[in-house]
């Protein structure tokens, strides 16, 4: 751990002296670990009571100090920390979206009552560069069905070239799915921003099917709370698609609907016609 420099420590019942810290690399939308050593520099003991009492937590602020995430994940104390005693704590840190420059501010909180900073104690304020979730923009495609000449032509025409090896994200399509030229770029943008699953809009050719797929109609923006599974999703390593409306789909959190990434779907494209 790296030693923390000198900082103001108030006189009173509740005061923290930050001694050392170690923070793992932060990637957008991903949890990592931090380890901190701190001393009870006040006159009152610190006690955790399950999810209540004194907890170690954090805020994410922008470079100007505006809160981005105020209530970070809590870490309870392993024991009562008496005045003058030190303790080491491991903290799970969930990085914000999108990547960029942030301030990661650790503080103690008396749960449901106050943060120690509010009663005069100094928090630990660290500059952190949150990196993109994916280290490289490498998108591959899995075709669920027989080869299709039109689908292949649409994939070759992508603005951002697809890869056949060492993909960091895999998009799941069906024969007759025709992604727009900017589709691959928009999916990779979503992964880079911090989402494990990114799915686009579906433009249905068959009129009889349009009501069935109305929730995925093109023309919308970006929505991390669509309320429906993503269709024809792009998924990071470790995720597998399910099925919804007879298409590859993803249901779960950590997902973004990218309404500008449009896939035109011919009739009978891997599903029964309505």
Residue positions per predicted region:
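Short beta-strand-to-loop acidic/aromatic patch adjacent to the donor-nucleotide binding site
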Residues: 165-180
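Conserved donor NDP-sugar-binding/catalytic core segment of glycosyltransferases
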Residues: 178-217
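Donor nucleotide-sugar recognition loop
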Residues: 245-252, 262-274
């Amino acid at each position: 751990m790296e030693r923390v420099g000198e900082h103001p420590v108030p006189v009173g019942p509740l005061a923290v002296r930050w001694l050392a810290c170690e923070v793992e690399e932060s990637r957008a939308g991903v949890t990592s670990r931090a380890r901190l050593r701190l001393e009870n520099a006040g006159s009152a003991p610190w006690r955790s009571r399950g999810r209540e009492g004194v907890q170690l937590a954090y805020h994410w602020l922008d470079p100007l100090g505006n809160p981005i995430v105020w209530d970070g994940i809590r870490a309870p104390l392993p024991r009562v920390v008496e005045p003058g005693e030190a303790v080491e704590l491991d903290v799970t840190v969930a990085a914000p979206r999108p990547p960029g420059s942030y301030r990661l501010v650790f503080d103690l909180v008396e749960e449901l009552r106050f943060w120690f900073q509010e009663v005069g104690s100094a928090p630990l304020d660290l500059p952190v560069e949150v990196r993109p979730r994916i280290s490289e923009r490498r998108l591959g495609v899995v075709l669920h069905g027989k080869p299709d000449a039109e689908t292949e032509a649409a994939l070759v025409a992508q603005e951002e070239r697809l890869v056949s090896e060492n993909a960091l994200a895999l998009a799941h399509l069906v024969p007759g799915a025709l992604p727009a030229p900017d589709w691959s770029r928009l999916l990779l943008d979503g992964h880079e921003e911090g989402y494990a699953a990114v799915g686009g809009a579906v433009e249905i050719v068959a009129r009889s099917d349009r009501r069935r797929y109305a929730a995925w109609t093109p023309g919308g923006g970006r929505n991390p709370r669509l309320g429906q599974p993503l269709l024809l999703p792009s998924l990071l390593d470790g995720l597998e698609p399910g099925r919804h409306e007879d298409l590859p789909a993803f249901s779960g959190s950590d997902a973004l609907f990218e309404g500008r990434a449009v896939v035109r779907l011919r009739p009978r494209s891997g599903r029964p016609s309505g």
